[in-house]
Amino acid sequence: MRRYAILGATGNTGQALLNVLLQSPDNQIHAYCRSASKLNRLRPEISQHRQVKVWEGSLEDVSLLSECIRGTRAVFMVVAIPDNMPHCTIAQDCTNAVLNTLKKLQAEGCQSLPKLIVLSSASLEDSLCADVPPLIHRVLNIAAGNLYSDLAKAEKILRAEKHWVSTTFVKPGGLVHDVQRGHTLSTKTAKTPVSFLDVAAGMVEIADMDDKTYDMMNVSVNAIGDGTAFPWKGVYYVLTGLLFHFFPWTYKYFGDSPMPKPRKDL
């Protein structure tokens, strides 16, 4: 029986991971979220599901987070927001919380630490986006620049800990809600679009590998064949992302989440 922890279980990728992992009756899932009531609204069956245990809390609660992560094979770090929030530090906050938790587990005598499977973006790697026209790539980087900056800083933190933490950075192209069509893993190119379900399946495949094939590597998940729906919602987020980039104060009125205050320590 394999145990996995999902950090960000109420998000799009977190929900997709639940779907993929529950395809096997042998998987045990530790779902961590800020709001158990939201998770129950999204998945009413979860509260009584024998394969799922839910932890409700903040990332700052290292004791609770350690209980969620303890004994798992892999931790899926998919805490995210969909829009270009100014001063975003959610990826860095999650990374620091997980590292503090792993240090706690080590201090308590834990002999085997889980892999970290981190959801990132292909836009951080020019090599994965070689097929994207330069102008479009530039626009996308501006429209999600705050998120990408946060992801890049979080990745730098994790790479500095490579001597004791095993991490894989999953960097897909544009994500969309669609059926699971099958996927391939690639370290050379990222194709858009790809469904959340296919990305989740790719993340699980990486987690289940017994070797360190993708340790500290950038890996994209690509859909097999054609037919994946066009990410029309992504167009909306590009437009609002440009708005938030040039006029950050507008996020207070049109953003998806409460706007954080700038932090001087990051």
From Swiss-Prot:
Annotated InterPro entries: NAD(P)-bd_dom, NAD(P)-bd_dom_sf
Pathway assigned to this chain's UniProt record: Mycotoxin biosynthesis; aflatoxin biosynthesis
Tree of life domain: Eukaryota
UniProt keyword annotations, A-Z: Monooxygenase, Oxidoreductase
EC number of this enzyme: 1.-.-.-
GO terms (BP aspect): aflatoxin biosynthetic process
Xref: Gene3D superfamilies: NAD(P)-binding Rossmann-like Domain
SUPFAM superfamilies: NAD(P)-binding Rossmann-fold domains
Function according to Swiss-Prot or TrEMBL: Oxidoreductase; part of the gene cluster that mediates the biosynthesis of aflatoxins, a group of polyketide-derived furanocoumarins, and part of the most toxic and carcinogenic compounds among the known mycotoxins. The four major aflatoxins produced by A.parasiticus are aflatoxin B1 (AFB1), aflatoxin B2 (AFB2), aflatoxin G1 (AFG1) and aflatoxin G2 (AFG2).
Protein name (database record): Oxidoreductase aflX
